[in-house]
Amino acid sequence: MKFALIYGLFCSKPRGPYRVDNIASHGLTGSESFYFNMVKALSDLGHQVDAFGFWTKEHVDGLVHYYPFTGGGDDMHVPEPASYDVAIAWSEPDYLRVFPPSVLRLCEQQLNDFPYAGEGFEKHVDLFLFPSDIHRKHVLSVTPRIDPGKTGVWGNCLSNEDYFTGKEQDRGKRIIYCSSPDRGLHWLCEFFPKVRARVPEAELHVYYRYMPWYRQMGQAWDPHNPPAHAQGMRARYTGAFFYKMGTDGESGVFLHDSVPNQQMVAALESSRVLAYPCDPVVFTEGFGVSVLDACAAGAIPIISDVDAFGEVYGGTAIVLEGRPASSRDAWVDTMVRALTDDTLQQEITSRCKAFSRKFTRKARAKQLLKIISSLRKEAA
């Protein structure tokens, strides 16, 4: 089949342009990794893939042709739109307007609503796909114009395939946090000193783009904008924590920047625990690729049961009930046990690694092909 995969400017411009001839040089988010992994997975299965996005240049790699947006804007030139079998837009359904109804048009929605989409966007989509059923239901609740019968679930994939090398590294007593800082880092800042008091060798390694977020949200004081005000409180609290504890290991705390995926693999594989006391201001986590990556890396994921986490990772990760505010002691006790109980580590690690193999890029691509086949049978 011939695929058009579109990663639009609304999602890609804040993070691009991307070097598609060396994508490994980027520190990709879970959604970005999913896109580029599907480009590779579908081409590896023998399909022709034209990838449209905010690239540094036009580039051909085997069965993949990368087409950059023209003129530095959102102009997308599609050679012969009717020649495609399937067009998939990542979170931006407006790009599907150019394709005729003869092309199967899918929108893979990673965001939590559609306020940026143009009027009538839903009329140009044959199927909306969501990473979890809870995410699907949330988006439908805030976007009633979408027909529930035109929706489905297609889970994300691992951000990297380098986890399954069989190599095992010394994990020490390292705890890692590698998600957006607004989603729960403030709780970890409260919990870690208590953990370190009981496990003196404990280290906390924080990844992702903390400083840009802190500089922006640390100035948010307006109580009439509750979501921004809440983030401002979190930013100032975490800033005070790093000021007190240091960022280079003085008190066991290390603040890292966003890093390329291969470095993130190494960081997760050398960590004993992924601690994610997720507590978003609004619905945020429709899947949580960082948790999936931790599963594959053999780090013990300790997460809160919010948004889609219980649905996706229940029975695999250690999922603590409710929001962290109602389970402070449980969070500290669980992290201490995960750092010190080798039997628990072996049990959880084995379970998580087996779970993660269901989410390789090849497995996700094959599921997509089944979805496409089913849609075609229904249309016949």
Give, region by region, the residue ranges found by the protein language model.
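Extended catalytic core of nucleotide-activated donor transferases of GT-like folds
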Residues: 37, 52-139
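Short hydrophobic beta-strand element within catalytic cores of glycosyltransferases
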Residues: 296-303
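Conserved donor-binding/catalytic core segment of Leloir-type glycosyltransferases
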Residues: 6, 167-184, 188-192, 196, ...
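Nucleotide-sugar-dependent
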Residues: 276-291, 306, 310-311
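Nucleotide-activated donor-binding/catalytic signature segment of Leloir-type glycosyltransferases, i.e.
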Residues: 218-265
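Donor nucleotide-sugar binding/catalytic pocket of nucleotide-sugar-dependent glycosyltransferases
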Residues: 126-141, 145-163
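A charged, aromatic-enriched C-terminal amphipathic alpha-helix characteristic of glycosyltransferases
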Residues: 30-33, 342-373
